[in-house]
Amino acid sequence: MSTEHTNTPRADSPQSAAEAVRGARQHAPAATPAESDPILELAEAMEGPLRIPAHTPEAVRDTVASLEKRLIGGQREFRRREVASEAGVSLHSARKLWRAIGFPELSDDEVFFTEADKKALGTMVGMVREGALTEETAISLMRSVGQMTDRMVVWQIEALVEDMIANQNLSDRQARRQLFSLLPEIIPAIEDLLLYSWRRQLNSAVHRMALRVETGVAAYNQDRGEDDGGTPLPLARAVGFADLVSYTSLSRRMNERTLAQLVQRFEAKCAEIISVGGGRLVKTIGDEVLYVAETPQAGAQIALSLSRELAKDELFPQTRGAVVWGRLLSRLGDIYGPTVNMAARLTSLAEPGTVLTDAITANTLRNDARFVLTAQEITAVRGFGDIQPYELSAGEGAGLVID
């Protein structure tokens, strides 16, 4: 991609935010002079990562400057070509890594990078040169870090702001201003927790990979009479969904804050139950959670516990779910394959308050007294033809114990 810039926009190129604001201002009476227009300043600040709107209070400016120096490892003193050159890579390769981690597009003359940025790029380039990683894998690793930490930071900031609003009687704007003063006090603790959690999660992943994957695949092959020769779907897992019924209509009747509380509570409750059951929360999509477990029994226990515990909470509407045991592919932190699709289809078929599974998973669970399997009507399912769903219910035993 060329690094040349031109001042003449293409006829089909989209307007920038600042250009759109200026265009709108030309056709409307300006309440304030253009040079002090806060909306225009905000639009320009969003396009230029080093700009702070002129009307920002000086105390906030000073705090932001102090926080930045602490967070990014020093003073910004390098341009992109200087950093790429010192790492011994082309600007094109460096930009691919920077984009993967979420850096904005920069011009050649913007002083944006610190010594820490040089070190980070040098580390990734060194791993590629030593043969530990391919360039494609390095980009994928950078993207995983960038996307996950971006979501994590937004989550943490909003949680802190919500806490200040609820417990300190502050407005949203006051809480966000106050957060500038709080962050320097809590950054070290959160940073330590991040590294601690990452190490713990990696350790759990190593155990799943090294100690249990073979057992899971062997159990799957035994159930289905297959072998492991050359399958493109190497992992055997129980895949489950839990879904809030009538979420769309419910969300229309709620104000934004109440809806946010509902979604946060749903995600937190599901994450707790899945963790207690030894599963892994793959992702949440508003009214739905997707999780995996390493055995069909663990997946079934989680599915039933989700149904039972969510039904106890008066804040939630009714829920429905499904769990299916089968092979899948794990990529980019997500999971793929017919097993995932089957679980999703069964979830959409389930009646409120019920959990469905497929015939093969039902057969696997049939001799376990903790579960009751009830055959349902044969149903045509898109992509699978006619299938025999089974309703999964609790049998003997207390199920998962949720404090």
UniProtKB/Swiss-Prot annotation:
It comes from Glutamicibacter nicotianae (Arthrobacter nicotianae). Keywords: ATP-binding, cAMP biosynthesis, Cytoplasm, Lyase, Magnesium, Metal-binding, Nucleotide-binding. Its EC number is 4.6.1.1. SUPFAM superfamilies: Nucleotide cyclase (SSF55073). Mg(2+) binds at residues 243, 287. Belongs to the adenylyl cyclase class-3 family. This is Adenylate cyclase. The keyword Nucleus does not apply. It catalyses: ATP = 3',5'-cyclic AMP + diphosphate. Residues 1-16 have a biased composition (Polar residues).
